[in-house]
């Protein structure tokens, strides 16, 4: 049997099916875009789910893939086993061939047997197959094609050999192929009590999708039958490399050996498991980040953080003192970057995230481990760690619960899950992660009390700009009030309903006026507390306002219009960024104001001028096309199923508002929007910058503010034209000439300054003061740059062996100090010390340099009159 590399196994599988008229379909993202029930893509068929159900048509009816997959959340959670067993992984590759109404059982079985026995040269006497116990058709095809005896075609009665997509939908019997590693390894045949041991290993699974489940009692034949298969690349490679452990294949061994060369710990004993965990989790972490997931405390981001921190804890166990994971990334990219180019594209970003997360976790890891050691000193085998300690490790030290369990596993100590979950529930109820309303102070408790008494504020502003509302609470200086009657007093106001939008989802709150029978109130901002109470920040302009009275609430219509314009533009921008920069782009934050918008994204490098132009052009094209903007309310699950973008870190209720902009954008959003994209008018990016490692910020203006920007720039150009006496066509040439001439003049000025400071030996002796056996030359000069002063001072100290030169340059609001000492006397006088003391004397922060030359600064110009006395004291002492 030929020995194949991992790359050769993958390549041969794909090549075989391409030769048999299958279309090679690239792997989809690990983030499913067609199945909200899945946290991650966990098999090859996920990207074809809608094809199997008939909801989607493609240009091909046969496909082959190598699909990146991940099992580390939900019911497919293999995390705790990874590294300790032979075949558990978080990240793995699933090879698969698929037929959508084309070939069926006979051809599928033929392809499988032909590829395994001829292309991969597996011995026939090493192979067993299983079928569903009623699938006589599959049994007859296996006998016909493979020639296997009846005892090697095993009928299974359980649902292990019958697959379904859910309670309803396509389903069908399965057939699995097993490889026998030999009698020297313990294990039983499929269907026996020892089937889960390591002798007989499943290497390929075929699903014969021939039925549709209508309901619990009814199942009918599908008119077009399909094939879905899956072969674990790592398992198959282990078989073809004659090893019984996936971590012994070439791909993992390369990563493990690379890691060993860095940490210098031998791969054996307990360390062996740590190396395996790191190798597996490096792959999972890197591919998740490449697909746009960032470590966080919720959802997919939290699964990523758990994986990363588990690997980092094992790196710590190997004695790694510095961040390790990012140093291993180049090896992974080298091994897998060709088949998965997203790794190469995102390498810099992945490296940055890996390093940042490890640095962040290392600061608390050792303290958390110390706490865990202290708390488990008295615990013995079979005991439980208290939920309180587990929660403290989670909340204070960033230990995911499964990391704590992983650490305690070898000591057979469990964790009190119930106690942990109770404390988690208390934390959520207190909303500690909210920017307001943690329940931990009197003020915060006030908001909980208001919410408990009055419930959520009804928002009317999607359809109304003004409304009559009842005032239910007035708050002044963090205390409830019955009446506000001091004019110009600032206070908070809550009503039963309001057309004012409370700041949320990145959109600023509304401003406007409230009129009651006896008062006029200016609303200077509108906020949202505890995600549901709309709070008006007000100033009393006239009269008095009372709790319980009705008032007319009027938003500033123009202000709201500009908010709508900029908010809708952020949705369009988001969609365009996906098209131009890639679908891995994730919104990290946004701010929608009435005058501009701000949009933060994960992106590892600066957005080029060419890309900015493309983005602007595409956004403006969508604006000009005047697409309709529709909003609907639906269940969150249904919205996501339809492809609506849900932002990571955002919390959503069971029902959400979905904003659809033509065929361009579909997002969950509670904000206010234009009716048609043409209402936006125009879009212009005004800045692009980095605000953190791997995060870029785009700022832009829309509508009338684009016109204003153009007018300002046009006026600026006209002013420059007038100043330099030229026209627009000659402006660049004229300015370039001026700048070049300015450089020449600066050089001439520097030469003049240097010449003016140069003195002959006789002039030095004449101008310098004789003190304590040395000569001191002190001069106050104008605003001359430090480079010239340094050069001039050094030139003079080279002419005399016992000279100290001190220049103090007086610039605009600051002083520059230069001190030079002849090298012959640096054993007695240190320029660095003198410069530092002078700086402190003149209000600076000190400075320094070498013994022979130093520079510093100050800003106490008044004290400059006493500098002579200070200089003398420094030299005489």
From Swiss-Prot:
Binds 1 zinc ion per subunit. Keywords: Aminoacyl-tRNA synthetase, ATP-binding, Cytoplasm, Ligase, Metal-binding, Nucleotide-binding, Protein biosynthesis, RNA-binding, tRNA-binding, Zinc. Zn(2+) binds at residues 567, 571, 669, 673. SUPFAM superfamilies: Class II aaRS and biotin synthetases (SSF55681), Putative anticodon-binding domain of alanyl-tRNA synthetase (AlaRS) (SSF101353), ThrRS/AlaRS common domain (SSF55186), Translation proteins (SSF50447). GO terms for molecular function: alanine-tRNA ligase activity; aminoacyl-tRNA deacylase activity; ATP binding; tRNA binding; zinc ion binding. The keyword rRNA processing does not apply. GO terms for cellular component: cytosol. The keyword tRNA-binding applies. It catalyses: tRNA(Ala) + L-alanine + ATP = L-alanyl-tRNA(Ala) + AMP + diphosphate. It is found in: Cytoplasm. Disulfide bonds: none annotated. InterPro entries: aa-tRNA-synth_II/BPL/LPL (IPR045864), Ala-tRNA-lgiase_IIc (IPR002318), Ala-tRNA-ligase_IIc_anticod-bd (IPR018162), Ala-tRNA-synth_IIc_core (IPR018165), Ala-tRNA-synth_IIc_N (IPR018164), Ala-tRNA_ligase (IPR050058), Ala_tRNA_ligase_euk/bac (IPR023033), DHHA1_dom (IPR003156). PROSITE patterns: AA_TRNA_LIGASE_II_ALA (PS50860). Its cofactor is Zn(2+). Gene3D superfamilies: 2.40.30.130, 3.10.310.40, 3.30.54.20, Bira Bifunctional Protein, Domain 2, Threonyl-trna Synthetase, Chain A, domain 2. It comes from the Bacteria. Belongs to the class-II aminoacyl-tRNA synthetase family. NCBIfam families: alaS. This is Alanine--tRNA ligase. It comes from Rickettsia typhi (strain ATCC VR-144 / Wilmington). The lineage of its organism: Bacteria, Pseudomonadati, Pseudomonadota, Alphaproteobacteria, Rickettsiales. The gene is alaS.
């Amino acid at each position: 049997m030929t020995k194949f590399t991992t790359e050769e196994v993958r390549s041969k599988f794909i090549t075989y099916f391409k030769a048999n008229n299958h279309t090679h379909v690239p792997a989809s993202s690990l983030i499913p875009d067609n199945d909200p029930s899945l946290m991650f893509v966990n098999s090859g068929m996920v990207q074809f789910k809608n094809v199997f159900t008939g909801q989607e048509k493609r240009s091909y009816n046969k496909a082959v893939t190598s699909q990146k997959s991940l099992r580390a959340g939900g019911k497919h959670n293999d995390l705790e086993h990874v590294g300790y067993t032979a075949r558990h992984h978080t990240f793995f590759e699933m090879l698969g061939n698929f037929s959508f109404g084309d070939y069926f059982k006979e051809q599928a079985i033929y392809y499988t047997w032909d590829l395994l026995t001829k292309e991969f040269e597996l011995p026939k006497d090493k192979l067993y197959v299983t079928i569903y116990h009623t699938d006589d058709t599959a049994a007859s095809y296996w006998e016909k094609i493979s020639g296997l005896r009846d005892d090697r075609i095993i009928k299974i009665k359980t649902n292990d050999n019958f697959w379904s997509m859910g309670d309803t939908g396509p389903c069908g019997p399965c057939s699995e192929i097993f490889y026998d590693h030999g009698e020297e390894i313990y294990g039983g045949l499929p269907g026996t009590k020892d089937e889960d041991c390591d002798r007989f290993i499943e290497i390929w699974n075929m699903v014969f999708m021939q039925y549709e489940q209508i309901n619990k009692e009814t199942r009918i034949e599908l008119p077009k039958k399909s094939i879905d298969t899956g072969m674990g690349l790592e398992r198959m490679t282990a078989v073809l490399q004659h090893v019984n452990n996936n971590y012994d294949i070439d791909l993992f061994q390369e990563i493990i050996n690379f890691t060993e060369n860095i940490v210098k710990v031998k791969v054996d004993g307990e360390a062996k498991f740590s190396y395996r965990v790191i190798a597996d989790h490096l792959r999972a972490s890197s591919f998740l980040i490449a697909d746009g997931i960032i470590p966080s405390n919720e959802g997919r981001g939290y699964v990523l953080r758990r994986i990363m921190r588990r690997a980092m804890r094992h790196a710590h166990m190997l004695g790694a003192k510095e961040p390790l994971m990012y140093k291993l990334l180049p090896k992974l990219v080298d091994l897998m970057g060709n088949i998965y180019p997203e790794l190469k594209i995102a390498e810099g970003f992945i490296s940055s995230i890996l390093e940042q997360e490890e640095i962040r976790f290392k600061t608390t890891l050792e303290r958390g481990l110390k706490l865990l050691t202290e708390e488990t000193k008295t615990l013995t085998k079979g005991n439980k760690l208290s939920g309180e300690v587990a929660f403290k490790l989670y909340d204070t030290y960033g230990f995911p619960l499964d990391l704590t369990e992983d650490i305690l596993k070898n000591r057979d100590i469990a964790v009190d899950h119930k106690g942990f979950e109770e404390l988690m529930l208390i934390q959520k109820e207190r909303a500690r992660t909210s920017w307001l309303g943690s329940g931990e102070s009197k003020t915060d408790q006030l908001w909980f009390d208001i919410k408990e008494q009055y419930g959520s504020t009804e928002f009317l502003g999607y359809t109304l700009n003004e409304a009559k509302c009842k005032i239910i609470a007035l708050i002044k200086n963090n205390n409830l009030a019955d009446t506000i009657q001091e004019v110009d007093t600032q206070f908070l106001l809550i009503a039963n309903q309001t057309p004012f939008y409370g700041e949320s989802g990145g959109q600023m709150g509304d401003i406007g006026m409230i009129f009651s029978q006896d008062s006029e109130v200016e609303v200077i901002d509108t906020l949202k507390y505890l995600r549901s109470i709309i709070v008006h920040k007000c100033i009393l302009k006239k009269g008095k306002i009372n709790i319980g009275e009705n008032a007319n609430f009027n938003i500033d219509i123009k202000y709201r219009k500009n908010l709508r314009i900029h908010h809708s533009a952020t949705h369009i921008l988001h969609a365009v960024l996906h098209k131009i920069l890639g679908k891995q782009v994730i919104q990290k934050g946004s701010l929608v104001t009435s005058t501009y918008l701000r949009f933060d994204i994960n992106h590892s490098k600066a957005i080029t001028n060419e890309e900015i132009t493309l983005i602007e052009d595409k956004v403006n094209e969508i604006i000009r096309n005047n697409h309709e903007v529709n909003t609907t309310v639906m269940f969150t699950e249904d919205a996501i199923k339809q492809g609506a973008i849900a932002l990571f870190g955002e919390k959503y209720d069971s029902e959400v508002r979905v904003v659809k902009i033509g065929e361009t954008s579909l997002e969950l959003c509670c904000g206010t929007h234009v009716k048609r994209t043409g209402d936006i008018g125009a879009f212009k990016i005004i800045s692009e910058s980095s605000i953190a490692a791997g995060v870029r910020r785009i700022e832009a203006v829309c509508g009338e503010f684009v016109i204003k920007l153009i007018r300002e720039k046009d006026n600026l150009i006209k002013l420059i034209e007038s100043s330099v006496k030229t026209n627009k066509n000659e402006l660049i040439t004229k300015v370039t000439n001026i700048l070049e001439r300015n450089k020449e003049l600066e050089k001439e000025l520097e030469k003049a300054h240097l010449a003016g400071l140069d003195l002959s030996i006789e002039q030095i002796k004449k101008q310098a003061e004789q003190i304590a056996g040395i000569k001191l030359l002190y001069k106050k000069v104008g605003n001359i740059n430090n480079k010239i002063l340094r050069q001039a001072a050094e030139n003079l100290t080279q002419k005399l062996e016992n000279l100290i030169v001190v220049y103090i340059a007086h610039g605009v609001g600051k002083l520059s100090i230069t001190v030079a000492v002849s090298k012959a006397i640096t054993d007695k006088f240190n320029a660095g010390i003198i410069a530092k003391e002078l700086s402190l004397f003149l209000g600076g922060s000190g400075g320094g340099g070498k013994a022979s030359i130093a520079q510093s600064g100050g800003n106490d110009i008044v004290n400059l009159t006493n500098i002579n006395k200070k200089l003398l004291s420094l030299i005489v002492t």
